A protein has these predicted regions:
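Generic signature of mature, soluble extracytoplasmic domains
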Residues: 118-123, 127, 147, 173, ...
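Short, well-formed alpha-helical segments that are part of the catalytic scaffolds
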Residues: 96-103, 112-136
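Structural motif
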Residues: 117-121, 143-146, 167-168, 192-193
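Acidic donor-binding segment of Leloir-type glycosyltransferases
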Residues: 129-169
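Catalytic-site signature of metal-activated, phosphate-bearing donor transferases
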Residues: 2-99, 173-180, 197-315
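Hydrophobic beta-strand segments of well-ordered beta-sheets in folded domains
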Residues: 112-115, 138-142, 217-220
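Short beta-strand-to-loop acidic/aromatic patch adjacent to the donor-nucleotide binding site
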Residues: 179, 185-198
Length: 315
């Protein structure tokens, strides 16, 4: 049994001196059996308006500046460093005790674009997304792996969005980069047609990108909740770097990833992308990805996707 982190839900822990470190959000704890108490203590400190782990260290846990930002955003707080040298990273991943002021985040307007990678067969989902988020984003662009006629037919149904077409040709990163170039907005949320941002993520988008701009970030990793045949799977948090500045680029034909210095990226753990999957499609995808690139099939991912979610642990 591997216990899940009480901040991000990850179950992969690293040994670091006398601590266990979450390999995702950077939380360090003395005893994994105290994770619930640790998260309550973190929230209490954030609610107090100041977290100074140098002057007032916690006994059971610690966070460095980057880790504190991860935790703060997860629980709906914005943070500002107590002391900052101009030109340095505001929240560095340096294992020093975090020191920051905290305030409750508030919904802010934004001019984020929504980019959708799609196949011609996904027309019904595209129309649903276009209607559901018509007023939630500055613009919506679909990049269709299809023909000009298919793109034109789709555009006629939803004329308030832009529909372009280009063959995927087995290269997910290249297709995402094309979509990045088409958006003409500073920040872009990219989704696939089987994904939907939940209400909490939609409400947070404005303050997230404003905070990211202050902190010099270009790529934000979102959690993805995989719903296989309608049931949440054990594959969580399944981080996806989908909220990005338009100048950020992806690499990797399969399982594409952002090309960005680590200090310019962060987790954004508030809300989630809901990902609807069919169990048979999960099995088929493993075979398809492996055929596209050796090792990309990741059978361990399939096993997690087909196992039920347990909020406490991966068993």
């Amino acid at each position: 049994m591997r216990l899940r982190c009480s901040i991000c839900g990850n179950w992969d822990w690293l040994a670091r001196d006398d601590w266990s470190e979450c390999s995702h959000c950077r939380l360090l704890v003395r005893d994994l059996n105290e994770l619930g108490a640790v998260s309550r203590d973190i929230v209490a400190r954030l609610e107090s308006g100041i977290v100074d782990l140098k002057l007032d260290p916690a006994e059971r846990w610690t966070l460095d500046p980057a880790g504190l930002r991860n935790a703060a955003w997860r629980f709906g707080f914005e943070v500002a460093p107590i002391a900052h040298v101009e030109g340095d990273a505001r929240f560095p991943p340096d294992y020093s005790p975090a020191r920051a002021h905290s305030t409750r985040a508030k919904t802010e307007p934004h001019k984020i674009g929504l980019g959708i990678m799609a196949r011609a067969a996904d027309a019904a989902d595209i129309v649903e997304i276009a209607n559901a988020y018509r007023h939630a984003f500055a613009r919506i662009v679909v990049l269709l792996d299809g023909t000009a006629d298919e793109a034109g037919g789709l555009a006629a149904q939803i004329p308030w969005i832009e529909v372009a077409h280009h063959p995927l040709a087995g290269d997910f990163a290249a297709q995402r980069n094309r979509l990045q170039d088409m958006m003409r907005t500073r920040w872009i949320l990219q989704i696939d047609t089987d994904e939907r941002p939940d209400a909490a993520l939609l409400d947070a988008l404005g303050w997230l990108v404003a905070a990211a701009d202050r902190d010099g970030l270009r790529s934000l990793g979102l959690t993805r909740r995989n719903l296989v045949d309608g049931v949440q799977s054990a594959s969580y948090p399944d981080i996806q770097y989908r909220l990005n500045r338009s100048d950020m680029r992806f690499a990797g034909r399969v399982h594409e990833r952002p090309v960005v210095p680590f200090v310019e990226s962060s987790l954004a753990l508030v809300g989630t992308l809901d990902h609807r999957l069919d169990g048979e499609r999960v099995r088929e995808r493993t075979r398809i990805y492996e055929a596209m690139s050796t090792g990309a099939g990741r059978p361990e991912d399939e096993a997690l996707l087909l196992a039920p979610f347990d909020p406490v642990a991966v068993r």
